Amino acid sequence: MLWFDLDDTIWDMSGNSVICLRELYESQGLDRWFDSHVEWDEVYHRVNRELWAQYGRGDITREFLRSERFARPLRIGGVSEGDAEKMAVDFDTLYLDSLGRKTALIAGARETLDYLQSRGYRMGIVSNGFREVQYNKLRSSAIDGYFDPVVLSDDAGVNKPHRRFFDYAVERAGSQAMRNIIIGDNLSADIAGAVDAGWGAIWFNPGGDAPCDGLTGYECVVDLRELKRRF
């Protein structure tokens, strides 16, 4: 069975997020605190990466992540702490609602999914993303029909790379007797977690990043269409 991470593996989280953040910048008058939407985007993504790393380790809750990823950039921009906290609640709702309606996929994603489906491969999603937005992404971009099941950390009770997440995915799919293989862009959450769980793993590495020292037992592709030569 083939398991795909969703964000930045199949669904273009980076590109879609930039559009949503620009919409927030313009609709909420953020030029009062940031010189450009580029500055706002850079500050947000720096903070968001730090918080997602903490969330993946279980150091913070999803509720804290969702509020702090907007409150902290606003404070950095000069918004008072109280106002930043209030604005962050609204920003989170607006952002996730907009994000769930975006449709851009990673280059070659649909072509590759069509090919794998035509070859009879069963495919599922494994994601740390929030339930209320991940299903909207799948439906809006018309890729929900490729995947069964969709396994989210909200349902598993733990995040990738925890072993219990991967065991839960296998239980949901009933794929204990199958070879489970993950394709994902995150070396620690997707690849290291899968290898530890005894899965096969293919690192989607479009940027050509250097691998982590000491991590073995996985393959690498820089374009999703390479999967057509492997399956």
Can you annotate each of these PLM segments?
Residues 1-107:
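N-terminal helical cap/lid subdomain that shapes the substrate entry/recognition surface
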Residues 1-2, 15, 110, 114-117, ...:
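Asp-based, Mg2+/Mn2+-dependent phosphohydrolase catalytic module
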Residues 38, 72, 98-102, 119, ...:
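Short alpha-helix boundary/capping motifs
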Residues 61, 103, 125, 181-182:
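Residue-level marker of alpha-helix boundaries and capping positions
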Residues 121-123:
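Short beta-strand/loop segments at the ligand-binding rim of alpha/beta enzyme cores
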